[in-house]
Amino acid sequence: MPSRASTRALQICQANQVRLHLGLRAIASLPLGLFITFFQAHGPDVGLIMLAAFSGAMALGNLAFLLAKQQTMAEATSTLAYLPVLLLSLFALFQPEEAFFALFITGVALLGVLTAAFEGYRAKAVGLSTRDGRDLLISALIALALGLMFLIATLDSVSAVGFFGAYLILFGVHWGIASATPGSK
């Protein structure tokens, strides 16, 4: 039977791993969102490149944490949300330019819906009464709002890429705050 001190040390170690993971997610999304915000062109080609970069960074980051045994397979389920989006956005870059916008809209809608599903699943698994569960639920709801907006609203190219950039910044700030917040009480 582990002592109370060793159990507490394990909890602190796990909390630090979660914070590191969230911090790396923030580092991946904030620069991409800022790039979109301050870059003059807001065409679907820029959106697709940023979508590929974001989904690739998220998928590789989750995979790296999984391989380094810093998270379990259940915690790495969000990788499943990013891989199809990465493949779609990379596939889209090799299509005629006329198809970029439709594929960008599809990719972002897919990202939003899949991320919402997997983050929501993880939030429920972790427990909504925990800080990590609430952070995951917030991520799921923001992603769901993005996915539904891209599915329902009629957006032009500039608005669509701008909303995606805003999503990246919002997620980056949320994950940054979550990673810098002291452990659960």
Regions found by a protein language model. Give the residues of each.
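N-terminal topogenic module of multi-pass integral membrane proteins
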Residues: M1-M73, A180-K185
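Membrane-water interface at the C-terminal end of transmembrane alpha helices
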Residues: Q11, F118-T130, F150-T154, F171-K185
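Membrane-interface helix-boundary signature
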Residues: Q11-L22, A41-G47, Q71-A74, E98-F104, ...
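Small-residue-rich segments of transmembrane alpha-helices in multi-pass membrane proteins
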Residues: S29-L32, L80-L90, D135-M149
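Structural signal for membrane-spanning alpha-helices in multi-pass inner-membrane proteins
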Residues: G33-I36, N62-F65, S89-L93, E119, ...
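Structural signature of hydrophobic alpha-helical transmembrane segments
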Residues: H42-A57, A99-V113, V161-I169
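Membrane-proximal helix-loop-helix units in multi-pass membrane proteins
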Residues: L86-S139
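Hydrophobic alpha-helical transmembrane segments in multi-pass integral membrane proteins
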Residues: L88-E98, A143-A160
